[in-house]
């Protein structure tokens, strides 16, 4: 029987006014690239934009993981590693907080808090354990664009309702 260790993490979209979060178990031996794909799936993102992952220690970036060597040029004063070559197990449980930022234009910050380790995990894939709230659609304009979007979607008499509803459907967004 397959047994491994899992990391139990809670991932919140960093919103001021809403709770959007997922609790997930992930195998201990995954890379930060794998974590990126897991978060994309959990929040219904389409992997259309750049991203990075920071390990945070005492509210400072300890290490930043990026997609490619070209991305390293933007952060010359930090410890930068390639996410595809870096395993989570090398950093957890020493560090308890990560920040996953997706789409630098909309700036979706996901706060990843490490809750605990599960020693008898019997899967080689991630499992969503719990969650709350709908994820925003791609390219909605960040947090405040999402609030505007929700106001329009809730008001069928709004002049932009039909257009916004059609756009939401094209983004596979659901209420």
Where do the language-model regions lie?
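Short linear regulatory motifs enriched in tryptophan with gly/pro/ser
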Residues: 1-175
